[in-house]
Amino acid sequence: MAEKIKIGTMWLGGCSGCHLSIADFHEKLLDVMEHADFEFSPVLMDTKYDEIPELDVVVIEGGIVNDENREFAEELREKAKFVISYGTCAVYGGIPGLRNLWDKDEVIEEAYINSITTPNEEGVIPSEDVPHLEGRVKPLGEVIDVDFEVPGCPPRSDVAAEVVMALLKGEEIELPSTNLCEVCPREKPPEGLAMDFIKRQFEVGKPEDDLCLIPQGLICMGPATVSICGAECPSIAIPCRGCYGPTARVEDQGAKMISAIASDYKVEEDKTVDPEEVAEQLDDIVGTFYTFTLPAALIPMKIKKEGK
């Protein structure tokens, strides 16, 4: 019998949801176990951080938030032959990446001093034996070389299981590369995705059946998001939030979506449309278009003017 492949998993700046998607392999987990053994997984097993063995494959969840994350990532890269960046936090920085809108010191002060849920009358900020925050959240691939990326918040378990099995069998791995709109079952109007208002879900109520959500005034990130999920959310009338990140052809997911919105409003064609009025309909532009990918954007953090 051939020697089994040694697999490890690690949880960095993430929420453990990606590890739950591994547990959700269900019976496919048995197929994985025929080819591999889990040798290291602090989330799923009673293993210690200081006992990282040599691994054939390591699946890493979460981005780089603090110096401990960086140290583990670098050690795992040394110990593993093949590194999978697993989940949107690892691939793009994820929701924790919105921390990049503030300085590190501002984040610490808000968490330990200003937060009403953290009684701290003496104003003590932990400093000893506590990992220090990086200057900004970074995708895993910005700190170490990764061999394959599986985005998703969390990744679909069936897709992830197929990726792992293909890897274990030495088969070629290929994920969908089209945008969400190309696989979405909702109908696009023949005149195009024109819109003249932006609404929130509660303002629309129940969207029209089978009609694309964008002409109904809803911000759906489908035009700027890769179709790995199969358009699960728009299929049940929930606008896509972009949790799988952009296609390989798109360098900046938020910029792509802003361009799509401008096109839907016909900003270039109709000179009576004021782009600033369009922007005013969005309360949180960064939080809307960069919810999951700010650390991987062309401008991955807030740039402050000198003196401000």
From Swiss-Prot:
Enzyme Commission number, as recorded: 1.12.99.-
Signal peptide segment: none
Main EC class the enzyme belongs to: oxidoreductase
GO molecular function terms listed in the Swiss-Prot or TrEMBL record: iron-sulfur cluster binding; oxidoreductase activity
Pfam families (alphabetical): Oxidored_q6
Record Gene3D superfamilies: NADH:ubiquinone oxidoreductase-like, 20kDa subunit
Domain of life, source organism: Archaea
Entry keyword set: Oxidoreductase
PANTHER family in UniProt: COENZYME F420-REDUCING HYDROGENASE, GAMMA SUBUNIT, F420-NON-REDUCING HYDROGENASE VHU SUBUNIT G
Family according to the record: Belongs to the [NiFe]/[NiFeSe] hydrogenase small subunit family.
Subunit structure: The F420-non-reducing hydrogenase is composed of three subunits; MvhA, MvhD and MvhG. It forms a complex with the heterodisulfide reductase (hdr).
Role summary: Part of a complex that provides reducing equivalents for heterodisulfide reductase.
Protein name: F420-non-reducing hydrogenase subunit G
Organism from which the protein derives: Methanothermobacter marburgensis (strain ATCC BAA-927 / DSM 2133 / JCM 14651 / NBRC 100331 / OCM 82 / Marburg)
Species classification: Archaea, Methanobacteriati, Methanobacteriota, Methanomada group, Methanobacteria
GN (gene name): mvhG
